[in-house]
Swiss-Prot record:
This is Lysine--tRNA ligase. The keyword Manganese does not apply. The gene is lysS. NCBIfam families: lysS_arch. HAMAP family: Lys_tRNA_synth_class1 (MF_00177).
Length: 545
């Protein structure tokens, strides 16, 4: 077995998923091979949750290529207790709202209860847990990854965990001994089971007796700690079956491996240093089950800060797909799992450019470095919906943002063809697919309010320039008409034209922005004008239309 942190780094294979698949295959697994991930549906599912889904997906695809039948399971740990109130929630249309916009009191009164026993704050699903699980399902569907969502609540209710619960309770002395190696405050009274109070619904931790023959435990509904807070128990004394409660996380996770027959599971570095070592020991010593092949990944950050549903610093898959094509988003997860990555929305253009180079590498662009081409050979077929016969036509993201300044589809096409980003012999399908990026880039410009967040003035604005500025604009029009300059040549000519006509260069740029954007400022004018239809530019510079 490779070191926990080395598996999947790409040091053994050009694409890390192949190295992970090698480890799984070396165990000669039964089919279907089961790849697992999981999340507690505590709030809005965000991009970070897709680390497990996408890492698992690429390993699953690598194994499928080798002829294995693979099942990709994702557990929604919806029998976990609500420990604190999230700052943000989302309805099923992905409208993100603050806690104050729903019945926060109803959520507060349900602290300590399982997510599936808490009413949906939007009133559309069976429970809080069902609501956020549905959002997760829709996100996976939107990104095009077929996962089998499994509810922990349903597994408990169906008896799937019965044997694991019985083993944990029957071997509770061993369980205590194992857990005490990884966790403080494990005394002789510790029992690895949380009964659910029949009176108030709280998951309590005070077990008074165990009847293995009857499959029940006695309990007292006592106070439980939730972070820095204490949730008061109601004091009820009763009995609970193995299905009316749950295992603690450090036992439930390895129990899932046994119940679902898990062969491979990626997880974040937080589990690598805590839950994984204890889970591995519990799996072997309490459940007599070999743990799956593990793989650790680094977390993502969002604009430099940790992604967190509870803290409200999130970006959803739905939001990202407004800004990027699905293949570009999937590509994000092909990168080395060992390195932390920041999803910086303001610099998405750089990331899209990186994807375009990656794609070009797959199609043999020799300017792409050898190691990147090797990775593209393996990973590119997994990130696209359908492998194209020839390289797709891609408009650079920032240029697409320029095209997004107008809603005129014909003008967009003219500008893209004029710039050479869409070849004249492109098919109708290639053109439509290339232009799809324009709406994505426009959404990015609006979201970040960057230098591309302007609208092209499609009719001549009301302008009045002094004689020197008017002469400079006419001279610039003649230059464009006769020279058909590229973007940098035109940018330089604007400076030279201003000097020759004794016009302040800032004033000449402002005049250009007024003519084309009806604004006093804007993006670099040379690249903007060189991207447009030449006749349109000449006529506008001459104030003719």
């Amino acid at each position: 077995m490779s070191d926990l942190y080395d598996l999947g780094t790409g040091e053994k294979r050009p694409f890390w998923a192949d190295a992970a698949a090698d480890e799984v295959e070396a165990r000669d697994p039964d089919e279907p091979v089961t790849i697992k991930g999981g999340v507690s549906p505590s709030g809005v599912p965000h991009l970070g949750h897709f680390n497990e889904i996408m890492r698992g997906y690429f390993v699953a695809e690598a194994l499928r290529e080798r002829g294995y039948e693979v099942r990709q399971v994702f557990t929604t740990d919806d029998k976990d207790r609500l420990r604190k109130l999230p700052r943000k929630l989302a309805d099923l249309d992905w409208n993100v709202v603050g806690l104050g916009e729903v019945d926060a009191g109803a959520l507060g009164r349900n602290l300590g209860r399982p997510y599936t026993d808490i009413p949906d704050p939007f009133g559309c699903c069976d429970s809080y847990g069902a609501h956020f699980t549905e959002l997760l399902r829709r996100s996976a569907e939107a990104i095009g990854v077929p996962i089998d969502l499994v509810s922990n609540t349903e597994l408990y209710a169906g008896g799937d965990f019965d044997a694991a619960v019985e083993d944990a309770l029957a071997n509770r002395d061993t369980a205590r001994e194992v857990l005490s190696e990884f966790q403080d405050k494990v005394d002789d009274e510790y029992v690895p089971f949380f009964p659910q109070c029949a009176e108030c619904g709280l998951l309590t931790e005070t077990v008074t007796d165990i009847d293995l023959d009857d499959g029940t435990v006695g309990y007292v509904c006592s106070d439980v700690e939730a972070g820095d807070d204490v949730i008061e128990g109601c004091g009820h004394e009763g009995r609970a079956t193995f299905r009316a409660g749950k295992l603690p996380w450090r036992f439930e996770w390895p129990a899932q491996w046994r119940v679902l027959g898990v062969d491979f599971e990626p997880f974040g570095k937080d589990h690598a240093e805590g839950s994984w070592p204890s889970g591995k020991a519990v799996s072997r010593e309490v459940f007599d089950t070999e743990p799956p092949v593990p793989m650790v990944y680094e977390w993502f950050t969002l604009n430099g800060d940790a992604l967190s549903s509870s803290a409200g610093n999130i970006i959803t898959v739905d939001e990202v797909l407004e800004l990027l094509e699905p293949a570009v988003l999937r590509y994000f997860f092909t990168k080395n799992p060992k390195k932390q990555r920041d999803f910086d929305v303001s610099n998405l253009d750089r990331f899209v450019d990186e994807f375009d180079r990656f794609e070009a590498g797959y199609f043999g662009d020799e300017s792409v470095e050898d190691d990147e081409r090797a990775r593209a050979d393996r990973a590119y077929p997994m990130v696209v919906d359908e492998l194209p016969e020839r390289q797709p036509v891609r408009i650079p993201y920032t240029f697409a943002a320029v095209l997004g300044m107008t809603d005129d589809r014909d003008l967009r096409l003219q500008m893209a063809q004029r710039s050479g980003h869409i070849p004249d012999d492109a098919t109708d399908d290639q053109i439509e697919r290339a232009l799809e990026r324009v709406e994505k880039a426009r959404a990015w410009a609006v979201r970040t309010d960057n230098e591309f967040n302007y609208r092209l003035a499609e009719t001549l604005p009301a302008v009045d320039f002094d004689a020197e500025t008017a002469a400079a604009l006419d001279e610039l029009a003649a230059f464009v008409e006769t020279e058909s300059p590229d973007d940098e040549t035109l940018q330089g000519e604007i400076y030279e034209t201003a000097k020759r006509n004794d016009v302040d260069v800032g004033d000449l740029f402002s005049a250009g922005y007024r003519l084309f954007l009806d604004e006093s400022e804007g993006p670099r004018l040379g690249p903007l004008l060189s991207a447009m239809d030449e006749t349109f530019v000449v006529e506008r510079l001459r104030r003719e239309g």
